[in-house]
């Protein structure tokens, strides 16, 4: 299926006619803009976002709530300023009704004010915490998770079930990595553990040798907060440096995504990660999704693919609730935050801030039919962005970052 960028130009008279004939206007196509990443270190996941969304639309014959759906795809390159420009083009040139995306936290933060200004309906994949916390964007809803939402259950599991006491954390030096590691550290230390080392390599660092040479070995494990293909690159060098038998790696939701797991070998076996999705989730919707995706692309869908497949399900459920009238933006936002919908990740709902409440899965890498998969070993149901903390108390603190919570147990 190919996509072409279309320009919709409205003359003043046409606009007036549309206002006079709302039913006829609503019978036109729903224009969905996908802002993803198809170049750079985040490209493997960004390409999967497009593939999965196209699959979902094809399954619905490109129709939702009785209206045709047109998809317009933009590549931000993972550059925040470019993402904002692409979003503005989608709104002002292509007249999209709704955006799915962007992929990365930094791009979502860069576009936050424009989303507000344009009142752009947004179903986000990006995990930027404060867009559904201290500075909630009224046009922004997220069916995936915040940066830390999957990391906090893993921290609980690491302390209470794996009995880890001393850990290091490493993540890309971007907001997503900072927020994820901060949430992990807070919960791990609240449960009695200590994070004794933190490292934040640049997103595009060509080699992790310097960081591997610095890694403490008198620790139980290291938490990996990488995005895109960086988790694969780090673990490959981690294994080459002979660290696999000395320090146990565990990872956040994108560290060993299926998009990169297919390129790994036995070094990945046994590694535990946490995510709101696994291709191994046993429900009919996911089975259909995985079988269709594998049939076309010859590998399992992961976080990024499931993100757009899930957001499309949220979009369809919301459109069905409002009779397809996506032009009524306040009605759409009220409806989307009130729905409960079954998806490939399981049932989900939304909190008053527009963020998802749903299951988080602990996964272990195993081999199945000759390929590596993220097998589910434990499920935390109904996880919110606030974990077990009271929302009002959680929101009194600063957003998770390199500076908060204070890293009080770091060792030189």
Segments the model singles out, each with a brief description of its role:
Residues 1, 21-37:
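C-terminal segment of N-terminal export signals and the immediately downstream linker at the start
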Residues 96-199, 246-272:
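Extracytoplasmic ligand/sensor domains, especially the bilobed periplasmic-binding protein
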Residues 44-49, 63-134, 201-206, 232:
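Beta-alpha junction/loop-to-helix N-cap segments that form part of ligand/metal-binding clefts
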Residues 183, 228, 233, 280-338:
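Extracellular/periplasmic ligand-binding modules, especially the Venus flytrap/periplasmic-binding
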Residues 1-16:
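N-terminal secretory signal peptides and thylakoid transit peptides that target proteins
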Residues 337-412:
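Solvent-exposed, acidic/polar segments of extracytosolic/periplasmic ligand-binding ectodomains
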Residues 83, 143-165, 206-209, 231-232, ...:
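Hydrophobic alpha-helical segments within soluble ligand-binding/sensing domains
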Residues 33-56, 74-80, 103-104, 170-178, ...:
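Extracytoplasmic "Venus flytrap"
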């Amino acid at each position: 299926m190919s996509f072409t960028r279309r320009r919709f130009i409205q003359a003043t008279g046409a606009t007036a006619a549309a206002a006079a004939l709302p039913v006829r206007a609503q019978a036109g196509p729903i224009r969905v803009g996908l802002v993803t990443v198809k170049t750079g270190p985040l490209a493997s996941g960004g390409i999967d976002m497009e593939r999965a969304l196209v699959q979902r639309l094809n399954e619905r014959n490109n129709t939702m709530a009785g209206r045709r759906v047109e998809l317009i795809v933009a590549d931000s390159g993972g550059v925040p300023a470019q993402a904002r420009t692409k979003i503005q083009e989608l709104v002002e040139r292509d007249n999209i009704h709704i955006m799915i995306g962007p992929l990365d936290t930094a791009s979502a933060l860069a576009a936050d004010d424009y989303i507000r200004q344009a009142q752009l309906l947004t179903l986000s994949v990006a995990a930027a915490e404060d867009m559904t916390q201290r500075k909630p964007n009224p046009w922004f809803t997220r069916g995936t998770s915040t940066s830390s939402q999957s990391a906090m259950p893993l921290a609980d599991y690491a302390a209470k079930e794996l009995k880890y006491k001393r850990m290091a954390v490493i993540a890309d030096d971007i907001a997503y990595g900072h927020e994820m590691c901060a949430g992990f550290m807070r919960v791990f230390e609240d449960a009695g553990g200590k994070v004794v080392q933190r490292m934040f390599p640049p997103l595009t660092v060509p080699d992790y040798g310097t960081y591997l040479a610095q890694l403490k070995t008198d620790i139980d494990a290291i938490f990996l907060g990488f995005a895109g293909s960086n988790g694969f690159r780090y673990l490959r060098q981690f294994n080459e440096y002979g660290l696999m038998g000395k320090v146990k790696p565990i990872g956040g939701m994108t560290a060993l995504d299926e998009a990169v797991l297919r390129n790994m070998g036995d070094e990945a076996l046994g590694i535990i990660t946490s995510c709101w999705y696994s291709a191994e989730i046993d429900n009919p919707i996911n089975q259909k999704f995985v079988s269709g995706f594998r049939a076309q692309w010859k590998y399992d869908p992961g976080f990024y693919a499931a993100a757009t497949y899930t957001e499309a399900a949220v979009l369809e459920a919301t459109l069905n609730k409002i009779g397809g009238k996506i032009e009524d933006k306040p009605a759409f936002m009220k409806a989307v935050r009130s729905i409960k919908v079954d998806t490939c990740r399981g049932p989900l709902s939304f909190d008053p801030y527009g963020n998802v409440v749903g299951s988080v899965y602990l996964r272990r890498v195993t081999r199945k039919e000759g390929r590596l998969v993220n097998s589910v070993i434990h499920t935390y149901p109904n996880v919110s962005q606030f974990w077990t903390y009271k929302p009002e108390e959680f929101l009194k603190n600063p957003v998770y970052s390199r500076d908060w919570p204070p890293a009080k147990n770091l060792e030189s």
